[in-house]
Amino acid sequence: MPKGEGKLIAQNKKAHHDYFIEETYEAGIVLQGTEIKSIRAGKVNLKDSFAKVEKGEVFLHNMHISPYEQGNRYNHDPLRTRKLLLHRREINKLIGYTKEQGYTLVPLKLYIKNGFAKVLLGVGKGKKKYDKREDMKRREAQREIERAFRERQKL
């Protein structure tokens, strides 16, 4: 399966709006207790999450996994920092990217592949306000073109 394939659980739609995504990496996640049950139930939010390289390891911050309903006292902290599993070579590349000004690591998708939870991590450069406006204009123009084609097809 190519990167980003598998049963999609959550997607960070805002990431493509806020960042130019240049490269993607597939990473495993170190989970505790009932977290995988909540993930399989789809109770995950990637909205404000980001990844950081700390002491040669990659950690995912602010990813919200809701507590499992039947988990009682074994439940986890919903916003805890989670370690990501990557090859050393990939981590070294990410260190190089994050040292450059303006680059950040953003989770794009969370999915289950072969029974394991995976995160598609994107290396992104923040968009300025005018870049966002330009993207919106381009999308609107594309919609107008498609609408005109559909009107032509009806006649």
Curated annotation (Swiss-Prot):
A single GO BP term for this record reads:
trans-translation
Localization recorded for this chain is:
Cytoplasm
Q: Which GO terms describe its cellular component?
A: cytosol
Instruction: State the Gene Ontology terms under molecular function.
Output: RNA binding
SUPFAM superfamilies noted in UniProt? Small protein B (SmpB)
- InterPro entries hit by this protein: SmpB, SsrA-bd_prot, SsrA-bd_prot_CS
User: Which key words tag this protein in UniProt?
Assistant: Cytoplasm, RNA-binding
Q: In this record, what's one Pfam family?
A: SmpB
User: NCBIfam families, from UniProt?
Assistant: PRK05422.1 (NF003843), smpB (TIGR00086)
Q: Which family does it belong to?
A: Belongs to the SmpB family.
The entry's function note states: Required for rescue of stalled ribosomes mediated by trans-translation. Binds to transfer-messenger RNA (tmRNA), required for stable association of tmRNA with ribosomes. tmRNA and SmpB together mimic tRNA shape, replacing the anticodon stem-loop with SmpB. tmRNA is encoded by the ssrA gene; the 2 termini fold to resemble tRNA(Ala) and it encodes a 'tag peptide', a short internal open reading frame. During trans-translation Ala-aminoacylated tmRNA acts like a tRNA, entering the A-site of stalled ribosomes, displacing the stalled mRNA.
Return the protein name: SsrA-binding protein
Organism in which the protein naturally occurs:
Geobacillus sp. (strain WCH70)
Q: Tell me the classification of the organism that encodes this protein.
A: Bacteria, Bacillati, Bacillota, Bacilli, Bacillales
